[in-house]
Amino acid sequence: MEPLKTHTGTIAVLDRVNVDTDQIIPKQFLKRVERTGFGQFLFFDWRFLPNGEDNPDFELNQPHAKQGTILVAGHNFGCGSSREHAPWAIKDYGFRVVIAPSFADIFYNNCFKNGILPVKLKQEEVTALMEKGKDTAYSLTVNLEAQTVTSEDGFEATFEIDGYWKEMLINGWDEIGLTLRYEEQIKQFEASRV
């Protein structure tokens, strides 16, 4: 995985609550196990009209949101069935950070495992970001090392994160990569047991 220490990008506002994994990536697109190629299906039923054209009313189809790399959403984001395809689609679409007041637990952990930083901010902070970014391009800097979210206009917030996940993202490790860091010690242990 690519390390994540600091990320600066434009926000895309999804002012909806209880966005479940079926809405993030609909079931008809779950027939593959590769981690790439799912971004084109992200929020498919909202992003596209029945004829396949972009839905002009959908938040992420607005010109200022199309280049967003930080998704700002409502509470309980990622609820519903457990599917790792949901963070795969979010990352493949181009989001590196998701900010919300709360996340479903399994989705929250799956984000870390796939190189996405889920940031929990207070409801009033998320509401302020939504107001700032709903109609215009609005840039944020998320500093994982300092655990801050800031902007040039003075917005500033802090967030909590488990030390394990923080270290994993900062170093760009997934669980397999972390295990491989101890490959020599594992071999020595195995040799001592023969």
UniProtKB/Swiss-Prot annotation:
The catalytic activity of this protein is classed by the Enzyme Commission as 4.2.1.33
Q: What class of enzyme is it?
A: lyase
Gene Ontology terms: cellular component? 3-isopropylmalate dehydratase complex
Alphabetically sorted, this entry's keywords are: Amino-acid biosynthesis, Branched-chain amino acid biosynthesis, Leucine biosynthesis, Lyase
Name the GO terms of the biological process aspect: L-leucine biosynthetic process
Molecular-function GO term, any one = 3-isopropylmalate dehydratase activity
Pathway stated in the Swiss-Prot or TrEMBL entry: Amino-acid biosynthesis; L-leucine biosynthesis; L-leucine from 3-methyl-2-oxobutanoate: step 2/4
Q: Which protein family is named in the record?
A: Belongs to the LeuD family. LeuD type 1 subfamily.
Assembly and partners are described as: Heterodimer of LeuC and LeuD.
Q: What is this protein called?
A: 3-isopropylmalate dehydratase small subunit
| Species assigned in the record | Halalkalibacterium halodurans (strain ATCC BAA-125 / DSM 18197 / FERM 7344 / JCM 9153 / C-125)
